From Swiss-Prot:
Pfam families: DUF440. NCBIfam families: PRK05094.1 (NF003469). May act as a double-stranded DNA (dsDNA) mimic. Probably regulates the activity of a dsDNA-binding protein. HAMAP family: Put_dsDNA_mimic. Belongs to the putative dsDNA mimic protein family. It comes from the Bacteria. This is Putative double-stranded DNA mimic protein YciU. Coiled coil: none annotated.
Amino acid sequence: MEMDLNNRLTEDETLEQAYDIFLELAADNLDPADIILFNLQFEERGGAELFDPSEEWQEHVDFDLNPDFFAEVVIGLADTEDGEINNIFARVLLCREKNHKLCHILWRE
């Protein structure tokens, strides 16, 4: 898979794309109670944070997760308004190269 460093989503575009995918698929993958909690609390304590892909993804995909081209977006709630997300609803793995649409999601169990 050949990728171009000059044809990548920005960090903001990556976050936005991951969040849009999360919203589209959440109803099919989360408990109704979790969806209600997320919707009620997101404005005050919710967030999406961008990271390099964690090692855990190697258990789920069979390709190299070069951080130049892949990002992990953690979506969830924090205990406080400015706190770190610790109540995770989904972890989204995205390819940032615009010509390679690839997404994997690990949902809250």
